[in-house]
Amino acid sequence: MPNIKSAKRRVKISERNRLINKAYKTRMKNSIKKVLLALSEGKTKEEVEQLYKIAQSAIDKAAKIGAVHKNEAARRKSRLMSKINKHFAIE
């Protein structure tokens, strides 16, 4: 438990930031799951690409505010796109 006034304020700020980061990460992970679910359900390429654009936006927003590192965001987008390309190359 912090005793100094500034430390007490920092506890409030860090809790607020934790919740904001958690929301961005959850949005990012859910959008990635939607893309992977669409692939497993056999949706068309156009539908999957539309979902990928939404996921890409969510990943970029999470990286922009610092919820995830920019390299992690790039890696997630790259891996997701390679899964999409691999799936549609088989067909």
UniProtKB/Swiss-Prot annotation:
GO BP term (any one): translation
GO MF annotation list: small ribosomal subunit rRNA binding; structural constituent of ribosome
The entry's keywords: Ribonucleoprotein, Ribosomal protein, RNA-binding, rRNA-binding
Ranges that cross the membrane: none
Stored InterPro entries: Ribosomal_bS20 (IPR002583), Ribosomal_bS20_sf (IPR036510)
Coiled-coil zones: none
Cellular component GO terms held in the UniProt record: cytosol; small ribosomal subunit
Protein family membership: Belongs to the bacterial ribosomal protein bS20 family.
Protein's job: Binds directly to 16S ribosomal RNA.
Protein name in UniProt: Small ribosomal subunit protein bS20
Organism: Thermosipho melanesiensis (strain DSM 12029 / CIP 104789 / BI429)
Gene from which this protein is expressed: rpsT
